[in-house]
Structures are given as C-alpha cells and as structure tokens.
From Swiss-Prot:
Ranges annotated as spanning the membrane: 163-183
Annotated stretches, region: Disordered: 605-624
Summary of the tissues where the protein is detected: High expression in the testis and weak expression levels in the spleen, liver, brain, uterus, lung, epididymis and kidney. Not detected in the heart or ovary.
UniProt protein name: Transmembrane protein 232
Keyword Disulfide bond listed: no
Cellular component, GO annotation: membrane; outer dense fiber
Sorted UniProt keywords: Cilium biogenesis/degradation, Coiled coil, Membrane, Transmembrane, Transmembrane helix
Amino acid sequence: MKAYKPPVVNKFGVISSTYHEELLKSIFESSNRRKSQKPKPSFSISKEFILRFNHTDNPAEEEELLEQARRLIVRSKRKLGLKTLGSGKHVHLPTAWAEVIYLAQCKGEIQDEALNMLHASLDHVSFDHDQLPALFFLAESVLYRLCCDAFMKGYLYSVEIKLVKIGYLIFLRLFVFFLHGHLESFKQHLLRLQPYLYALHFSEPSYYKYPNIISNVQFILKTSEIICKRELHSEPFVESPDETEDPYSDLNHLQLNKRGYEVNHLLWHSVAAWSCVQNNRPQLTEVLEHLLFYKTQLQTKCWLDSALALMVLGEAAKLDMACLKTLMDLVTDFLENILSAQNQEENYNIYDTSWASEIVFTYTTIIAEVCLYAATSDLRKTALIGFCACKSPQQGISLTDKSEELPELDGASILTLLKYFSSRISDNCEKVIWIGYYGIVYNLVKMSWELQGEQDQDGLRNMIWQTLQKIKDYEQDPRIRCALVIAQAELNGPSDPFCTKATPNSGEEVFSKYIGWRIATTLSRLFFPSLDVAPPKTPVEVDLPRKHTIRERQPAKKRVLRFILKDHSSVVEVSMTPYPNFFTKADKKLEEIIDHHWQKDMEARKREEEAYKAQNQKDKEEKEKIHFQEIMKQRERKLNKQTKPYEIILSEKESGSEKKCGFFELKPSTAPNAK
C-alpha cells in the first residue's frame, strides 16, 4: 500500500532550520507577552483598589475611584437580590457577600452602603447549607474588624454598631444550621474563629453601658460556646483561672453528644403555634395552652432557646391575636417571677441578671416589630397599649409622678412596660429594670424613625412622638438619656473611626424584618416535615448508608413531644407554606391589572350600548316626524287645507277683540270660505 505524504509548505521561504526555530520561539513569546499584559477589568475589587481609594489625595482620581466603587455597589446589589428577597437567576450570594465585605473596607459612604446591604441581605435571604463557607468567611471578617479596629477606639461609633448587628445575624444563622446538623464538616472554620471570640469575650465589659450592643455580643458568645462544645467536643474556649465557678456552667446539663442538640419544649411549641397559624389549623388553642404550661422554661439560664422561642412566637403574634396574648402573658409571668426572686435575694448571683436582662431586651425588640409590622391595626394597637379598655392611652403614662404607690405589672405592651419600668428606675435598681426601660426607649426612637412618611399611621407615630417628648422632658436618669442619644446616632449616622467623611444613609433597615420569618419557616420544616419529604410508613429499601438514616431519625425522636404526634398526627402532615414571595405578589398584581382592564372594557361596552339606544331613539323620532309630514301633505292635497286636523280657525270679530286685548295677531286663514 502506498504511503500518502502531504506536501510541505514553507511559509517562511528558504531559511535555515536554526533560524526557523528562533523565529517560532520569538512568535510564541510575543503571543504570551500580549496575554500577560492584558489589563484587569475595571470592575474587579483588589487590595490595590482599596488602598488607592482610602489614601488618594488627587481630587480627580478620588472622583474616578468613587464612581467605580458606586458601579461595584450597583453590581453587588443585583447579585444580592435585595429587591427579590435573595431569589432569582442573577443572585449569587457567596460571591456577592465576599465583594460587599471587601467594599466595606473603603471609607465614607461606600462603607456605610456596603454594611447596610450586607445587613439587609443577611436579614431576608433563605437558609441554604451551601452558604456556610461564605458565612464563616463573613464571621471571621466581622470579628477581625471588631477586635482589631473597633476595640482600639475610645468611643462608640455607628460602624461598630452595624458590625455587631451583622455579627448577630451571622451567628443566628450558624445556630440554625447547627440545629440541622450541617456544621460537622466545618471544625477547621470553628477553630479559626476561637481567637477572635476570645478577644470579644474580654472586650465585653466595655459594652455594659449599651444594652443594645451587649445583647448582640452575648448572643454571639453564647452561640459560639454551644456550637464549639458540641462540634469540637472540647471545653469552652473561655476559661477564667481566677474564678472557681465557670460562668457557663449552665451548659453542663445539656446533652451535647453525638446524638445532637436537644431543644426545649418552649421552642418546640412556639414553632408548632406558628405552623398552626400559617396553615389555619384548629389545634392552635391547644398548642398555646401547652406552651403556657412550659412557661417556666423561660426562666432557665440557658436562654438561647428561649430567645428563639420568643422570636418565633413574635412572628405568629403578627398574624394572630391569641398568639400575641400568649406572648404577653409569658413575659408578664417571667418579669413577676424574676423580680420577686431578686427582691428576696436568695440564690442570686451576677449571672442571673445577665440572662434575664437578655430575655427582656429581646422581647422589647420583638414587641416593637409586632407594633410596626403586624397584619391588622388591632394587633398593632394591642402591642402598643395592651388589652385595656381605656379611651386615651396617654392618660395612663406619667413619668413625673414617682410616688410611693408603684403600679403593678398588668401586661407586657409597650406603654404598660414603659409605665412600669419608669416608676421603678433608680440608681440602685435591678439590672432588669433599667435595661428593660432602655430597650423600650431605644425601640421607640427607632419606631418613630421607621414611621416617617407613613400617612396611614400618623396616629401611631404621633403617640410615639408624644411619649418620647415626655421622656426627654422629665427623665433625668443618664442611662435612659443615653438610649435616646445612641438610637438617634445609629439612625443619623455620625462620623466613625474608619472613614474621614460619613453621610447619613436613609436606606438603612432599622429592624430585622424577615429573619424571624425565615427562622420560623426553617424550624417548622425541621420539626414538622411535610408528607413529600417525610419517610414512608411502610418500610422501603433505600440505597443510603445506615448511619445516615439513623442520624436523620434520631434527633426527630428527641425533639418530638407526645401531645402533638400522638393525639394530633395531622400536624405532621401539614405543608409549610411561607409568606407570599416575590412571584406570588407579582401574580396577584397581574390579576389586579387584568381585573382593572376588564372593568374598563365593561364600562366601554356600557357606553356603547347607551349610545346605540340613543341613536335608535333619535331614528325613531325622525321616522315619526317624516310620517307626520307625509300625512299633512296628503291632507293638503285632498282638502286644500294647510291646518292640522281639528285646528280651530278664528273669525275676524274674534280676531279684532283679541288684538284689543293685547294678544298676538294671528295670520288670516287661507281657506276660501273664511270671512
């Protein structure tokens, strides 16, 4: 068989082999050189960009970098999905979170905008275990900023408050993932967080004057303590060699072993109540009765589950009056028992006030959110003034008269707690009293700011404004006046140590509007799986390892309470439907638009029918007129008369007398026989 040899084409002419190799080598190097010298895209965030942005002195370059940073902010907003609650094909949260935390290192308005975007995103996005690496990166970045930048300053700044609020949302999400058992493969990430948590623990006393910050800091430390003790199987990262008693000894009774973390009954029943409200289940009354039966669990020093229970029950209270009453009854009973125990001074130590004040401050935030975002006006009014029948709620508030007859605690509404705490505030009062008073005043300022521009709620805003004016005029306690200053500074955005210029940002989210709903939805799916995800009743062989099957079923056996699963098995079978999302609202809006156009079409048809009837009437009258004219023509032709039938013709005498009387003159008849 002949071998085919293609012809050799020499593109370089007749040259030597050595020169040919050198020519090919130079062409290859030049092509690689052009690729390596390709500039980076202008939209990339790098260390050089941040350094140039923060240290440039050239006004032209500063304006150019600021414009580029604004374009980066717009791109990050789209990736975060701030307008769609973190959903959509264009959303990529891990990348967007990393970009935003990098942009937060820039000075001025870019830093404020980036932190506000990150806080809003962490508030409203749904829970997905693919977010865990990015969440740990955010946690490490925020803790680093707090420990290495914020703690070095001698004053409190708005950026520091925002960082603490963002850290609270991050660790709240990590704790929910911990309840699902998703943190088992992130031990290395937890170890990297421990030095920063250790520094945060020792800087905690610097925040004791600010309950709004110390509340978030204590939540971060408590959450990390439980997660690290469970996942790392070691002692707590905080140890006090000078003290014989462990400040976190209340964790020793928890069953933090391989079988998982056991939630208390209060949290379980709160999630059950929320599920009943969401699905309109008739078992709501019985669930609330059982929830009140476990109200003593709110008084345990392991308060993390209690805080989550109040948060979930607060979400149910935004939709149902019975849940709101149960929430108020829980807190009223809690305050009465805690204050009576402190007055007796039995078994009282420094850690009791810490966890009790944490519960009280958490409740003040929850009841403020209910007052703002409840579904009906009755719920909002009840959250503000309680279940009283008084006509004017302002009559019940008196901040000037602190007489010996102190009012009793008859509810847990905002104004009721304000009246109760203000009558008992003093220099040596219990920590729960002044922190509760601080929380009420702090949230009232934020509520007044949130209601700006809401014309439908002018009455609520006026009542809050009048209450704040009374507090400003008559309250002399420096801790309460500090609450007014801190809240106003947080909303107005003063200067901070991380930037040379700061502008107030009106787009900042004052309250975390969605995180409670997200947590309630996720926990309801964990505690009460729907039929499509629940394992079948008949044994079916599944190609999964046995260890994985046991790990899924064992926590459910520990968390399940008998009264629901045994007596009311239908609770497990309900499908958990979340609040209307963006697409549901869009469909509803489209339906309204279609209905509007249908109404316009009906009105147009009605106008056409009326015009058609009017035209028919006009044509009918025209036909009658033509018919009458034809009759008159026939009469004139036959009788030679132009008078109408039965028309009377006057004689000349009668016509003359009528002229004398002043009547109009009539034309003489044209009939031939007329005289």
